[in-house]
């Protein structure tokens, strides 16, 4: 049997397992997730040893290193997240709409699983736990294609998950980890009839690859080219704190600030706006007006003149761009041209300007006077998320349990037939 044939055989088994998941009641699903959380401490050394093998192959200066890293604290957090998912209300079998037709037919629109969800992701082994929990809670089977950089970690995690599933007398094929080789991704992306939807989580290059090569429907998530616009009416202290938080809280995640846009009437305030960034050694790529305003006010080794490419970059590291604009309209145009439609923010005190920004900026999450770091399912009160959708169909913004469901119509009658 070729590797391609073996993968297809596994995909068929996952599809069969997905039909069994829908027969599980909510208590059985929650018990499995809680059991998995309870098993993590005993499995920690095995998982961390596998993770160390992955880390040894990566440069610690690589922005992906932090996302790849697991430790005891992060495993404890993962266990807590699993219990939190178990405690969430089930998104399944909810009556979304109901009506009685004039002919007496009773119609109900109810939430149901998507079926089999394929996830392609990079570096972050915690995603393996997160995705399984969210897919199971929403009644879906899961096919995972992790990156080769996290291969050892993902194998150890999936082995633990499948052990817990087997011990509870359930079908371990409800989760399947594809080989790390790139060819496996091509098979997944073209597994029409086996996979219901693909969700890529990672860099823009990964998302573009999935969109270009997939014949299975794709929900795009993750890539964020994020702006914060400091308006002429912005509060200086507020802007300074928001910029610092949005850039440095977790620079390797998709909601981190990439480009600060500053109204030219406030350019004299720019050194104060970015002064805290020096503490974290943030490298700044500034357009000429911003560069010369910061010269000798920000460390020379951390300051460069920006190129056009800087303004279309998702840095995922302690780097950012600064763009100065003459008008509010120019700020909107810059965002429209460079945004990935993930998260965008304004710092302003003029309500008319805030209202215009909120209405006219096209993004999944649009903020006024707060940090873009809040783009997160848990922060939105949605529970854990599978990613941040940057498209408009099916789901937009944090994809939590509800977004992992679709619906079907249930129609009950008393013998009605449709007239000729």
From Swiss-Prot:
Q: Which reaction does it catalyse?
A: L-glutamate 5-semialdehyde + phosphate + NADP(+) = L-glutamyl 5-phosphate + NADPH + H(+)
Q: What Gene Ontology terms describe what this protein does at the molecular function level?
A: glutamate-5-semialdehyde dehydrogenase activity; NADP binding
Compartment annotation: Cytoplasm
- Please give the pathway this protein is involved in: Amino-acid biosynthesis; L-proline biosynthesis; L-glutamate 5-semialdehyde from L-glutamate: step 2/2
Q: Which Pfam families match?
A: Aldedh (PF00171)
Keywords tagged on the record = Amino-acid biosynthesis, Cytoplasm, NADP, Oxidoreductase, Proline biosynthesis
Lineage, top-rank taxon, reads: Bacteria
Q: Does the keyword Phosphoprotein apply?
A: no
EC main class here is oxidoreductase
List the EC numbers from the record: 1.2.1.41
**Coiled-coil region:** none
One GO BP annotation is: L-proline biosynthetic process
Q: SUPFAM superfamilies, alphabetically?
A: ALDH-like
InterPro entries per record: Ald_DH/histidinol_DH, Ald_DH_C, Ald_DH_N, Aldehyde_DH_dom, G-glutamylP_reductase_CS, Glu-5-SA_DH, GPR_dom
GO cellular component terms, semicolon-separated: cytoplasm
Q: What is known about what this protein does?
A: Catalyzes the NADPH-dependent reduction of L-glutamate 5-phosphate into L-glutamate 5-semialdehyde and phosphate. The product spontaneously undergoes cyclization to form 1-pyrroline-5-carboxylate.
Question: What PANTHER family does the record point to?
Answer: DELTA-1-PYRROLINE-5-CARBOXYLATE SYNTHASE (PTHR11063:SF8), GLUTAMATE SEMIALDEHYDE DEHYDROGENASE (PTHR11063)
Q: Which family does it belong to?
A: Belongs to the gamma-glutamyl phosphate reductase family.
Please report the name of this protein according to its UniProt entry. Answer: Gamma-glutamyl phosphate reductase
What organism is recorded for this protein? Answer: Chlorobaculum parvum (strain DSM 263 / NCIMB 8327) (Chlorobium vibrioforme subsp. thiosulfatophilum)
């Amino acid at each position: 049997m070729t590797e391609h044939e073996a993968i297809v055989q596994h995909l068929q088994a996952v599809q069969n397992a997905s039909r069994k998941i829908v027969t599980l009641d909510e208590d059985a699903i929650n018990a499995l997730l809680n059991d998995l959380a309870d098993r993590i401490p005993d499995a920690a050394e095995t998982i961390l040893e596998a993770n160390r093998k992955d880390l040894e192959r990566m440069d610690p200066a690589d922005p992906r290193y932090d996302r790849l890293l697991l430790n005891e604290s992060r495993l404890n957090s993962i266990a807590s997240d699993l219990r939190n998912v178990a405690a969430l209300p089930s998104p399944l079998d909810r009556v979304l709409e109901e009506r009685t037709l004039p002919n007496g037919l009773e119609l109900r629109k109810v939430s149901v699983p998507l079926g089999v969800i394929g996830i392609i992701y990079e570096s972050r082994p915690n995603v393996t736990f997160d995705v399984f929990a969210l897919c199971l809670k929403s009644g879906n089977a899961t096919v995972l294609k992790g990156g080769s950089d996290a291969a050892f970690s993902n194998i150890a995690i999936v082995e633990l998950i499948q052990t817990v599933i087997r011990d509870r007398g359930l079908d371990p094929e409800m989760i399947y980890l594809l080989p790390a080789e790139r060819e496996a991704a091509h098979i997944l992306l073209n597994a029409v009839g086996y996979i219901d939807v693909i969700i890529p989580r990672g860099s823009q290059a990964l998302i573009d690859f999935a969109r270009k090569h997939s014949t299975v429907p794709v929900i795009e998530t993750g890539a964020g080219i994020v702006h914060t616009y400091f308006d002429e009416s912005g509060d200086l202290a507020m802007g300074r704190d928001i910029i610092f938080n949005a850039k440095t809280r977790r620079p390797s995640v998709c909601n981190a600030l990439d480009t600060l846009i500053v109204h030219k009437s406030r350019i004299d305030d720019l050194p104060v706006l970015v002064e805290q960034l020096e503490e974290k050694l943030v490298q700044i790529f500034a357009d000429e007006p911003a560069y010369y305003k910061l010269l000798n006010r920000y460390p020379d080794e951390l300051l460069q003149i920006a190129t056009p490419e800087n303004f279309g970059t998702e840095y995922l590291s302690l780097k950012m761009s600064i763009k100065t604009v003459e008008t509010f309209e120019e700020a909107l145009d810059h965002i429209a041209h460079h945004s990935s439609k993930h998260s965008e923010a304004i710092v302003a005190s003029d309500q008319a300007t805030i209202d215009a920004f909120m209405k006219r900026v096209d993004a999944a999450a649009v903020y006024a006077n707060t940090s873009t770091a809040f783009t997160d399912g848990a922060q939105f009160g949605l529970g854990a998320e599978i990613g941040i959708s940057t498209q408009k169909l099916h789901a937009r913004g944090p994809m939590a349990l509800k977004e992992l469901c679709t619906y079907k119509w249930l129609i009950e009658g008393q013998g009605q037939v449709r007239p000729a």
